[in-house]
Structures are given as C-alpha cells and as structure tokens.
C-alpha cells in the first residue's frame, strides 16, 4: 500500500500546496472526511473550515471558505474559493471573512432569494463565526 498521495491546493489567488501527504482532513459540506492514499474516487463540496494536511514533513492547516475536492486513489485536488495558511491567519483576515458572510446573508434576505440561498448564507455566517472561536483569534 502506498504511504503517501499527491495533494494540491489552489485558490483563485495562488497555488498554496503541491506535496506528498499521508492524509488530509477535509471540511466537506456533508460532513468532515479524511482522504488517504488509495481512497475511493469522490467529489465533494467544501464548507468553511480547517483543512489539515498530514505530510512526512509535518502537519499544515489552512482555512478554506468553500470550494471543491476531488479525491482519487492517487491523490487529492482541492479548488478552494479562498484558502489561507493558518500561520498567516490574523484577526483582520477573520473579521473580513465574517463581514463578507454577513453581507451575503443580508443581500440574500433583501433580495427575497430562494429559501435555500438564505439558509446557505446563514450557514456560511455561522461557520465563519464558529471558526473564530475555534482559532482563538
């Protein structure tokens, strides 16, 4: 059995990681999951949360605000709406993300958007606020 798999993390701003990983914990929209070498093929959407990479060189964490993850037996590719390495995360970053989520929620309510869009915006806001508590920022 393979000990590692290829892991790639990209956002519209930049490529954040391309390395061999033993496991990657993913904040999936339908629940958290861990991708490992020889994983069954899966495609999932991401919710706001912490993506944790366990590599031979150590563990790295990234805050992601959403996106997609494609898992294959050979590796994992994550296309994140926004991704920030946790060692670069500041209170200002978090406040900006929370304000964006509040704006999305308010806009969805004011536009009388479909009920699902309002719920999605409310969930995004709650997830972003919970991340602030989790990160102790």
Swiss-Prot record:
User: Magnesium among the record's keywords?
Assistant: no
| Gene Ontology CC, one term | plasma membrane
In the bilayer, the protein is annotated as: Peripheral membrane protein
Sorted alphabetically, which CDD domains does this protein's record hold? F1-ATPase_delta
| Gene Ontology molecular function | ATP binding; proton-transporting ATP synthase activity, rotational mechanism
Sorted alphabetically, the keyword list is: ATP synthesis, Cell inner membrane, Cell membrane, CF(1), Hydrogen ion transport, Ion transport, Membrane, Transport
Using the UniProt record, give the first listed, main subcellular location. membrane
In terms of SUPFAM superfamilies, this protein maps to:
Epsilon subunit of F1F0-ATP synthase N-terminal domain
Q: Spell out the subcellular localization from the entry.
A: Cell inner membrane
Q: Name one Pfam family in it.
A: ATP-synt_DE_N
Explain the purpose of this protein. Answer: Produces ATP from ADP in the presence of a proton gradient across the membrane.
Q: How does it assemble?
A: F-type ATPases have 2 components, CF(1) - the catalytic core - and CF(0) - the membrane proton channel. CF(1) has five subunits: alpha(3), beta(3), gamma(1), delta(1), epsilon(1). CF(0) has three main subunits: a, b and c.
The UniProt similarity line reads:
Belongs to the ATPase epsilon chain family.
PANTHER family this protein is in? ATP SYNTHASE DELTA/EPSILON CHAIN, ATP SYNTHASE EPSILON CHAIN, CHLOROPLASTIC
Quote the NCBIfam families the UniProt record gives.
Answer: ATP_synt_epsi, PRK13443.1
Q: What is this protein called?
A: ATP synthase epsilon chain
Top-down, what is the taxonomic lineage of the species of origin? Bacteria, Pseudomonadati, Pseudomonadota, Alphaproteobacteria, Rhodobacterales
């Amino acid at each position: 059995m393979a000990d590692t798999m290829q892991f790639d993390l990209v956002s519209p701003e930049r490529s954040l990681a391309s390395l061999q990983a033993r496991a990657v914990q993913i904040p999936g929209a339908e629940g958290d999951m861990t991708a490992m070498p020889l994983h069954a093929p899966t495609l999932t959407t991401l919710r706001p949360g912490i993506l944790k990479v366990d590599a031979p060189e150590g563990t790295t964490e990234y805050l992601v605000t959403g996106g997609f993850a494609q898992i294959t037996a050979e590796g994992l590719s994550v296309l994140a709406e926004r991704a920030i390495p946790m060692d670069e995360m500041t209170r200002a970053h978090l406040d900006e993300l929370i304000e964006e989520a509040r704006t999305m929620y308010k806009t969805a309510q004011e536009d009388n958007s479909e009920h699902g869009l309002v719920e999605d915006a409310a969930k995004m806001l709650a997830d972003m606020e919970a991340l602030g508590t989790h990160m102790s920022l």
